[in-house]
């Protein structure tokens, strides 16, 4: 269950935008829940059959985001939500949301430019 955070108010409009236009830009203040609520709500809405990748600029932030989302589902990282950072990965065959760093995403694109199996990419902290 996702916590009751300010971003919850924007989720219906965000899901509608993603369903109708296939892309959206979301801006909200720090602590609103963008990082930990949006990917889970996208998954719940069934917006894609593929995995949801979320790009985090820092390794610590990537691990923390994945751990928080997994915890909110009552799971451990590597189940529904996982992460991949340099030197460490917690993903499994059932992972649907994967938090990655820039280096990991770059390698994924170099290996598979079409990102087969990926249905959505979220750029968190896009300003960085």
Residue ranges with predicted function:
Residues 2, 8, 16-17, 22-128:
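Conserved P-loop/Walker A NTP-binding site and adjacent catalytic elements of P-loop NTPases
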């Amino acid at each position: 269950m996702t916590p009751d955070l300010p971003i919850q108010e924007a989720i219906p409009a965000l899901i509608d935008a993603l369903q109708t236009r296939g892309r959206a830009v979301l801006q909200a203040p720090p602590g609103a829940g963008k990082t930990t609520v949006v990917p889970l709500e996208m998954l719940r809405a069934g917006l894609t059959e593929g995995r949801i990748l979320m790009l985090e600029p820092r390794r610590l932030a990537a691990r923390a985001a994945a751990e928080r989302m997994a915890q909110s589902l009552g799971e451990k990282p590597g189940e529904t939500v996982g992460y991949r950072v340099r030197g460490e990965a917690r993903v499994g065959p059932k992972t649907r949301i994967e938090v990655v760093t820039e280096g990991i995403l770059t390698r994924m694109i170099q290996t598979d430019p079409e990102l087969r199996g990926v249905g959505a990419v979220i750029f968190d902290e896009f300003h960085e």
